[in-house]
């Protein structure tokens, strides 16, 4: 992902406009990778019916750390994570949160095992800037055709 963004930087500056922005983007990609590790373990365990208290707790903590950091980065009311335009950090964030929303499809399984959903109904109140940014990205013209139907499908499972 990083290499592709660097190759096209003259046309699409997804890796920032200077070394400072590139460094910030790298930081977001690194924390996204840490979150992705625990979220993938969690989502795979959910799909296999093997989620346990340890896996659930690690994913819950990973999400809280990730979302808290993003919430702080988006303060005060930034429209993007780095710089003044969409960057690789925003793309990665949108992809990670959309993938994590697959938890919605396993709400019944979580309930049967006595676990609450990590992306519970009030999570948007806990991280308002994160979810406002995600909503902006879903409606971004280059994301909308693919991301919006995917997220809507997952949200419909949460409502069910």
Task: Pin down the residues of each PLM region.
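Alpha-helical packing segments of well-folded alpha/beta enzyme cores
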Residues: 59-70, 96, 130-134
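Preference for well-ordered, secondary-structure-rich cores of eukaryotic proteins
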Residues: 10, 15, 38, 48, ...
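GST superfamily/GST-like fold recognition
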Residues: 25, 81-116, 123, 137
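N-terminal DNA-binding recognition helix of tyrosine site-specific recombinases/integrases
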Residues: 133-141
């Amino acid at each position: 992902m990083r290499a592709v963004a660097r190759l096209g930087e003259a046309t699409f500056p997804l890796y920032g406009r200077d070394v400072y922005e590139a460094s910030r983007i790298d930081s977001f990609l690194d924390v996204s990778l840490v979150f992705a590790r625990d979220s993938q373990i969690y989502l795979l365990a959910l799909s296999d019916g093997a989620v346990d208290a340890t896996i659930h707790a690690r994913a819950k903590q990973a999400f809280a750390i990730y979302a808290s950091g993003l919430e702080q980065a988006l303060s005060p009311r930034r429209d993007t994570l780095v710089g003044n335009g969409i960057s690789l950090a925003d793309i990665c964030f949108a992809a990670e949160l959309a993938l994590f929303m697959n938890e919605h499809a396993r709400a019944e399984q979580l309930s049967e095992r006595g676990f609450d959903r990590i992306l519970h109904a009030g999570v948007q109140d806990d991280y308002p800037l994160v979810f406002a940014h995600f909503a902006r990205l879903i409606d971004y013209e280059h994301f909308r055709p693919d991301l919006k139907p995917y997220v809507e499908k997952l949200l419909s499972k949460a409502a069910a």
